[in-house]
Each structure stands twice: as structure tokens, then as C-alpha cells.
Amino acid sequence: MMKSFLLVVNIVALTLPFLAAEVQNQEQPACCGNDERLFEQKKVLYLLSYPVLNNYLRTAPSYYQNRASVPINNPYLCHLYYVPSFVLWAQGQIPKGPVSTDIHQSTMQYHQAKHPSFMAILSKKILGKATILSTDAIAAPEQTPVSAAQPTVSAGDTPEVSSQFIDTPDTSVLAEEARESPEDTPEISEFINAPDTAVPSEEPRESAEDTPEISSEFIFSPETSTGPAIASMA
């Protein structure tokens, strides 16, 4: 009795899937059109939106890299930070900034990645040329411009003035020479003994009548007279 019951249960379990498939195939032609329309509408709305957005972003003028804003206060999100590789950089080009302190930050942060063009590496030849140009620019002397309004006087333009200034003797020296040698320079002796060219003095001048001896001595001085004239006067 139990054996026959188990056989019937196994047969029914094997035949139930096939019976269910046949029932679905019989009910499908009745609502096939509506299901296909709904499926196509969902497919179009879901699949065409992504290419349209991509095409719009590619054709639109974008001046920065589009990055979605990520909340900082959410502890369950894994933030991706872009770390530049300093392996190819020189030792002087590695940025060494101060350690950031714990300060207040906004709740939204925009993660931006550097474009590869910003990480261009200069060759050694270009760096050498740049340093040479900088040293030449520093070592070049600055020439002061000479204005045309200021005339430049050379020593060769005025030879007469310098010679006259050097050759002009002192009048006191000429007077002493005339007193020592009156025969050689008669004009200078006359200029010295002339009454009109005498230097005026503050004291009152005595006339020749009041002082005959002084006037005779002044006129017939032994420096300007000969020997016979002195003998006759005596």
C-alpha cells in the first residue's frame, strides 16, 4: 500500500512542470501583445537615457572634469583619493606642504583628478638652458642713457682759455721785477710811478709843496735815476 502511494507521488511530481508549461503556452496568445509593448517601453526608457546623456556631455563644452559630489560625513562610503606618483619627478619638484590641521570643512567635497598634461617633466637640456638664460639676464650691466640736452665739453675744445689762465703772471711779481730791473721794463716802472694810478688811502694825502724833500726823494730815487743826476741834486 505504501509502495503504490510513493509511486503515484513521484509520477505527479515529474509531470507537474510539464503541465504548468503547457498551461502557460495556452494563456500566452491572449495577452502577448500587451506584454511586448510594456517590455519595449521599459527597455527604451532605460537604455536610451544613458547614451543620450553621454552624447550630450561629449558635445557640450566642458571646462573642468565632471565629478559627482560626495558627502564627507557618511562613514560607510569609501573615498577614493588620487595620489600622484613621484617616482618620475626630480627631487626639487616634489611638493612638500604643511600638515593640514583639524579645521571645519564643508559637508560636500568635489574630488578632482589632475590631468596628465599638468605632470609634464622637463628634460635636463631644457633645464640647463633656462638656468643659463637667467644668469645672463642677471649679469648683464645696465647702461645709463646719456641725455642729448647736456653738452659734453672736451679738453681739446678750449686750449686757449687754459693756456691764458696758466700764463697770466701776478701783478705783485711784475712790480718787484720792475723795481729790480727798470731798464728792461720801462713801461711797468712808469705804471708804478704814475700819480694817477696810485691806490687811494683813507689818510689825507700831503701835497708836494708841504713836503718837498719826500717828493724829491720819490721822483729821484736811486733805483730810477743815474749817478750824475744824484750828484747835481746834492
From Swiss-Prot:
GO cellular component, one term: extracellular space
Residues modified by glycosylation: 144, 162
UniProt cross-references to Pfam families, sorted A to Z: Casein_kappa
Major localization class: secreted
Polar residues composition bias: residue spans: 144-171
Sequence repeat ranges, renumbered to this chain: 127-153, 154-179, 180-207
Key words of the record: Glycoprotein, Milk protein, Phosphoprotein, Repeat, Secreted, Signal
Tissue: Mammary gland specific. Secreted in milk.
Region (3 X 27 AA tandem repeats): 127-207
Localization terms from the record: Secreted
Matches recorded under InterPro entries: Casein_kappa (IPR000117)
Family per record: Belongs to the kappa-casein family.
Protein name in the entry: Kappa-casein
Organism: Cavia porcellus
Highest classification ranks of the organism: Eukaryota, Metazoa, Chordata, Craniata, Vertebrata
